[in-house]
């Protein structure tokens, strides 16, 4: 990742990067250090913003956007999982907006400009490294809503299976549940196209086949590579059926009262589906 990132940074001539992280695992496990060294090697000044919540809050987005403006940031680098990447997309949009970030969430058409985003993915899960959308929470209004814009596609995403080896088993499984949730909500629609159906079935088989392998041997890079492929394709539209999908995965956005608790997306989905089934 470091070598490829240094090449990208040099060719694009960025000057100041906001590096966004979550709870600290990327610092403990060494991924952040590699990114910081790549930025330093390319002559890019670094401003760090850490502590993104498990369900990113608009208050954090506003603070980070203000920091971008104050420091003259011209690049945002997300290091972590989907929630860090979601927050970073919102930060990219909010940095160029004359007003609170929540205005953009309520009306996505207000996104007129955005900072470029690079992502360094550390878990196979949401596929946020390869789409143009985010989900942001507002504790004050008790809402959790999507933000999407063509200006929010990452300019480049670095996806290295070695960066996922240190993910705990519990979080690993939660990520794979999230992957399957994305695909199943698209699979169970009326009149799904045969091409999309076949693609989704193949990806689901890949997740089912490789998950036990990774849990048995976390250092199996081949299995982790396959799971990262499955994650990356989940939300980028390649399997878009052009029909309304199931609501189970989307319903998690409505559980705003749960936002005070750091519960991963997929575990909420599983609980809700089980409740409906019993």
Residue ranges of predicted features:
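Carboxylate- and glycine-rich phosphate/diphosphate-binding segment that chelates Mg2+/Mn2+
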Residues: 133-236
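Predominant activation on well-ordered alpha-helical scaffold segments within soluble catalytic domains
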Residues: 6, 33-36, 47, 62-65, ...
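Active-site nucleophile and cofactor-binding loops and adjacent substrate-binding regions
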Residues: 52-53, 79-81, 241
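ATP/NTP phosphate-donor binding region
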Residues: 1-75
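Short, acidic Gly/Pro/Ser/Thr-rich loop/turn segments
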Residues: 3, 26-27, 124-127, 164-166, ...
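C-terminal charged capping/lid subdomain of soluble metabolic enzymes
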Residues: 233, 237-278
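Glycine/threonine-rich beta-strand-loop-alpha-helix active-site module
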Residues: 59-162
């Amino acid at each position: 990742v470091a070598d490829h990132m240094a090449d990208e940074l040099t060719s694009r001539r960025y000057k100041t990067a906001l590096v966004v992280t979550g709870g600290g695992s990327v610092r403990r496990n060494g991924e952040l250090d590699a990114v910081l060294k790549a930025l330093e090697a390319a002559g890019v000044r670094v401003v760090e913003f850490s502590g993104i919540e498990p369900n990113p809050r608009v208050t954090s987005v506003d603070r980070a956007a203000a920091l971008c403006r104050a420091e003259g940031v011209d690049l945002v680098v997300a290091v972590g999982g989907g929630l860090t990447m979601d927050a970073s997309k919102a930060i990219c949009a909010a940095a160029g907006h004359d007003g609170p970030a929540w205005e953009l969430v309520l009306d996505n058409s207000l996104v007129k400009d955005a900072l470029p985003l690079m992502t360094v993915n550390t878990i196979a899960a949401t596929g946020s490294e390869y789409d143009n959308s985010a989900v942001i929470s507002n504790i004050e209004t008790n809402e959790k809503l999507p933000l999407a814009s063509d200006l929010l596609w990452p300019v480049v995403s670095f996806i290295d299976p070695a960066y996922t080896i240190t993910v705990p088993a519990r979080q690993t499984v939660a990520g794979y549940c999230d992957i399957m949730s994305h695909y199943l909500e698209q699979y169970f629609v009326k009149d799904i196209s045969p091409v999309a159906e076949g693609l989704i079935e193949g990806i689901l088989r890949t997740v089912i086949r490789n998950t036990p392998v990774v849990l048995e041997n976390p250092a199996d890079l081949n299995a982790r590579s396959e799971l990262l492929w499955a994650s990356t394709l989940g939300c980028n539209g390649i399997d878009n059926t052009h029909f309304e999908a199931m609501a189970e995965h989307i319903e998690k956005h409505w559980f705003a009262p749960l936002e005070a608790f750091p519960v991963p997306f997929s575990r909420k989905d599983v609980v809700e589906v089980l409740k409906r089934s019993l």
